Amino acid sequence: MYSNKSFQRRQRQQVAESRSEEKFSRSLVRLNAQSLLDSSGNNTTTKNVNSDVVIVVMEGRGSCEGHIGIALHDTCFPEIHLCEFVDSREYTTLKTMINVHEAFDIVIQNGNEERGSTKLLGEALMTAFPEASLQSISSKYFNSERGERQLQSLMNAEVSTVSEGCLRRTLALGALAVLLKYIHETRCVFFRVKSLRIKEMGVNDTCMIDFVSWESLEIVDADDASKARKFQMKQKRTLMSVLNHTVTTNGYRLLRSSVLQPSTDVYLIQSRQEAIEELIGKPQLKDKLRRTLSRAHELDRVIAMCIQTSTSWTVRESEAKINQIIKLMHTLKVIQGIRTLLHSAKMKSNILIEKTEFLKDPRFDQIMNILVEKVDDSLLDGKKNSLHLQNTKCYAIRHFVAVQLDLARQTYEEIIRNVEETGAREIAEYFHGNSSVRLSFSQSRGFHYTFVTRQAESVTIPRYFLDVFRNRTTVTFNSRKVIAYNDRLEQVVAEMFLASDVIVCDMIEEMQPMIPVLYYAMDALSSIDFLCGLATYSDLRDTCKPTFGPSFSISQGRHPILDWDDSEKTITNDTCLTRDRRFGIITGPNMAGKSTYLKQTAQLAIMAQIGCFIPANYASLPIFNRIFSRMGHNDELIRNKSAFASEMSDAAAIVQYADKNSLVVLDELARSTSTEEGIAITYAICEKVLKLQSYTFLATHFLDIAALANYSNAIDNYHFLPQTDENSTKKHKLLRGQYRGPLYGFELVELSTIPDEVIEHAQSLATELRANVEDTERDYDSERRRIKVYMNHRFRECAEYFMDTHGEKWKEEKEAIDKMKALRKYLVDELAKIDSQEQMCQ
């Protein structure tokens, strides 16, 4: 058995690769906070990092300054991602990508610290990711020509998405050369020729959300962002936790990446919407798909096993391969079930038809035939105890395939019989056949005795037995004879695993031409799980399918997280921003709902761009390329930044990078400084954002900011009412117009322990100041002009909607006539209200 080709090839490979490349290893320099920084920075990344993800960063110099090339690989996932982009000096895009993929090992260039380039990058990454393993390596290893040769050698063209332009991206190719070298030296892993999927990541086909906004907008919880779906227990409600109805790890991974980087491809979004709509209409099919998917194993680790070769050959690795080959066979049966379900349902949505065609590939049957010939999965449906799980792997290869394996099995069975006989004899001799004492088996201890009793602390175990451990209701122990059998059993099991591994390697070699179909299956299963999860959410709540256009219009929208917790008590609010009226200023009381409304706006936009239905009666949104937020006012003491400095840093990024395809939400901008400075800075930033033509919502306590609407028709004023019910609960209802209600802050002050005379004096001063402000003249002509522009857009929007739904004869529809009459009445009433207010002031 040990003279076959696979074994000989492994021996030659071990000898050839035993010579480690010491120069590369010595050139790796571990960077830490002490070597780069005078003081450590805040931890802005997740607390739980993934040590399997490696990212290599190459920064451009000279004429390429500002360009970043990255190569990224998860050693448990059969893909390498390449990307090259232009980034800011704060490395915002790079930090976001590292957070999305939860990379732990980060490798950068060294040798240029004296000029400051690498040091700036190192400081930025160490500050943002203090728990990551940051290392630098000599620039000579960033060889783009070598990276291109390796790409051409390892890439499987059928499943890879690498354009011709990628071959000219020298920074990404240089990073690829170091990545492959690093994986080889630190993980002892090689990739088979023409087996790897290499994907070119684009930064222009996704909506970029700054990773600082992930937690402030309640998209993900930073403390639990890197935990796998099945390990997430009690945690703070986030958009991710509300939408997560996936049943596979890869489905969860696709959902997370989609939420953190929503798509900007309208065709992809609409294809997802069609699939979700179809799945909602077929609830039985959706439930069957989810139940079937829950039985599937993750193909990423199976593919990784098939495309990777290691310089070591251990019993543990052999056992893992046997386990993966069993999972592959089981998953292929699941694929057959999903294929049958989708085919019989006669799906109409393009994305589900495409995935069904992938699953019909004849190469699945070819792989199954290879496995059926040598793999026996008859033990999979038996008992699920530890001994059965070991037997599943020991008997995974069919009988009469390898003589040495069959001989080892005979020895294994003989040892099992002997240890069972010994156990029965010792229990009868020392415990007189007590039924509470039995022979047990575990992976860690092997065979041992278990005494089940409620008096574990006081029960007496004969001195003949060893290794006595007392738990609450059991006592475990062993004997010398059983321990001797365990040692022999461990040796025989190792022989069986190594012998089986040779057969598994032969099957992997035979399956190599069919490996691309496993990539298709992995994508298909994760996509179907992703769509079923979104369909489950959309079906459980009152949602609508959003459309896409130039206006940001939502009718009766609800906060996704609040709606999930208690849909009956959730307050609905409208949202309306257009190209002509693209800036909304929101004023109102404390705790009235301003911040919650801003989060609702951003979350609904994200949900729409991942293809999900959103909690509203009607929604039409633009496609956003970037979403900016400035929320929260915390000092960053470790980085020596005050709350105001942190605010201005975020505002600078917005002013610099926002454009007409951006959504900007600002919560109480410049609150952490004096009133005069705060108003002036807010004015200036608002004027700049207006010129950028971004869709913007600003929540502020500076009532003077609302006067900006007098100078620009692009601004609308909104406010929340201060009135409360008997339980001091705010109404949380957004209304049009500037806030002109009472001095709402004193309602909360009166609930505190501040003396009454202090509160009364403060109220008198505030009333006097308020009266001075209200003496300012209102520009009624501007208000009339704004309401006319706004209603003109509403008329046009309604006409387009009814034309799409009813065709050219939409004007004859009663619904359209009633809607137009209602809009006309609203316009007349608003103009009359302005006229009456003007007459009262004269």
UniProtKB/Swiss-Prot annotation:
Result when mutating T238I: In it13; defective meiotic chromosomal segregation
Gene Ontology CC annotation, any one: nucleus
Described purpose of this protein according to its UniProt entry: Required during the pachytene stage of meiotic prophase for the formation of crossovers between homologous chromosomes. Together with msh-5 and zhp-3 plays a role in the activation of DNA damage-dependent apoptosis at the DNA damage checkpoint in pachytene cells. Not needed for pairing or synapsis. May promote crossing over by interfering with Holliday junction branch migration. Has no apparent role in DNA mismatch repair.
GO molecular-function term, one example from the UniProt record: double-stranded DNA binding
Region feature Disordered, mapped onto this chain: 1-21
Disrupted-gene phenotype: Worms show maternal effect lethality producing 95% inviable progeny from hermaphrodites. A high proportion of those that survive are male. Mutants display severely reduced crossing over, resulting in lack of chiasmata between homologous chromosomes and consequent missegregation.
Annotated gene: him-14
Organism, as annotated: Caenorhabditis elegans
Protein name: MutS protein homolog him-14
Subunit text: Heterooligomer of him-14 and msh-5.
GO biological process: chiasma assembly; embryo development ending in birth or egg hatching; homologous chromosome segregation; mismatch repair; reciprocal meiotic recombination; resolution of meiotic recombination intermediates
Family: Belongs to the DNA mismatch repair MutS family.
Positions with a binding annotation for ATP: G588, P589, N590, M591, A592, G593, K594, S595
Principal subcellular localization: nucleus
Pfam family, one: MutS_III
Outcome (variant: D406N): In it44; induces temperature sensitivity; defective meiotic chromosomal segregation
